């Protein structure tokens, strides 16, 4: 498969680049709107039958359900193909619904790289099977989605986008059923430096509007403190221990209810006074 912006290829698909296809910018560095290196028709396909997708992963081809008779890198619904399979055709690297192939299976068999219309596979799924790299008409997958399935990197049967998105399903990396995306972006909207859904080419960040409960979108992003102070919802429970919201290395807070036995949450915190009137809950120090 082609790889935008990487001379040596990307990840396991074309080694030398990192999982994000290192060296690519948020806009798939070095790739033009036509998916750099691929023609407007997506490498051998006519512009009327293939939808180019461009991202910094080992993907530079057409949406797997294009209707042309043959494609350079991706398959049509009934024709042969170089790397991706169609619903009824044979293949070189991927399987069709009824035909065997070099690396993948047919309609009912598993496969190494791409799947048929009904068969699951190691890397790509069919219409009902999960997949990792390419999707079928109805199956979710790890990297490419089907018409109703979520995805991480590529698009499904109806919704194209910069990096991902199925026709009805959300995705892990980029836009949804109606919206394309650049680096981030939800189902309809793009994003700047943060917010929206998370892209593989855009590390999650805090929202410019502040650090509320939805500020950090995944465990990959260090939790932010609430700008209003150190309330109970300041740090997110899934990725933050009950620290004060004053700094990233803040010691545990005392219970706001007083200074009982549960006031200080670890031995790292100075003990509070036994009476609630002489305890400062935020920093676990005594009022003396």
Curated annotation (Swiss-Prot):
Annotated stretches, region: 9 X 4 AA repeats of C-C-X-P: 49-281
Alphabetic keyword roster: Keratin, Repeat
Keyword Protease: no
Keyword Nucleus: no
Annotated Sequence repeat ranges: 49-52, 55-58, 61-64, 201-204, 220-223, 239-242, 249-252, 268-271, 278-281
Tissues and organs where the protein is expressed, per its UniProt entry: Restricted to hair root, not detected in any other tissues.
A cellular component term, taken from the record's GO annotations: cytosol
Subunit relationships: Interacts with hair keratins.
Function description: In the hair cortex, hair keratin intermediate filaments are embedded in an interfilamentous matrix, consisting of hair keratin-associated protein (KRTAP), which are essential for the formation of a rigid and resistant hair shaft through their extensive disulfide bond cross-linking with abundant cysteine residues of hair keratins. The matrix proteins include the high-sulfur and high-glycine-tyrosine keratins.
Membership in a protein family: Belongs to the KRTAP type 5 family.
Record's protein name: Keratin-associated protein 5-4
Species whose genome carries this gene: Homo sapiens (Human)
Native organism taxonomy: Eukaryota, Metazoa, Chordata, Craniata, Vertebrata
């Amino acid at each position: 498969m082609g790889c935008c912006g990487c001379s040596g290829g990307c990840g396991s698909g074309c080694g030398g680049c990192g999982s994000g296809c290192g060296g690519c910018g948020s806009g798939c560095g070095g790739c033009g709107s036509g998916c750099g290196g691929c023609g407007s028709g997506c490498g051998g396909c006519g512009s009327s039958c293939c939808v180019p997708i461009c991202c910094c992963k080992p993907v530079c081809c057409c949406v797997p359900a294009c209707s042309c008779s043959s494609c350079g890198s991706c398959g049509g619904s009934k024709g042969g193909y170089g790397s991706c399979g169609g619903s009824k055709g044979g293949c070189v690297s991927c399987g069709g619904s009824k035909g065997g192939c070099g690396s993948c299976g047919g309609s009912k068999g598993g496969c190494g790289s791409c799947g048929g219309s009904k068969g699951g596979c190691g890397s790509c799924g069919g219409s009902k099977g999960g997949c990792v790299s390419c999707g079928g008409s109805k199956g979710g997958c790890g990297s490419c989605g089907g018409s109703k399935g979520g995805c991480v990197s590529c698009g499904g049967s109806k919704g194209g986008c910069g990096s991902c998105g199925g026709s009805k399903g959300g995705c892990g990396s980029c836009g949804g059923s109606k919206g394309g995306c650049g680096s981030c972006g939800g189902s309809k909207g793009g994003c700047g430096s943060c917010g929206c859904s998370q892209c593989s080419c855009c590390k999650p960040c805090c929202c410019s509007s502040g650090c509320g409960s939805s500020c950090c979108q995944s465990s990959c992003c260090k939790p932010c403190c609430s700008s209003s102070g150190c309330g109970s919802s300041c740090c997110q429970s899934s990725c933050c221990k009950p620290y004060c919201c004053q700094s990233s290395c803040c010691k545990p807070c005392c219970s706001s209810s007083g200074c009982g036995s549960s006031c200080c949450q670890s031995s790292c915190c100075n003990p509070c006074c036994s009476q609630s009137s002489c305890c400062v809950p935020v920093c676990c120090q005594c009022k003396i």
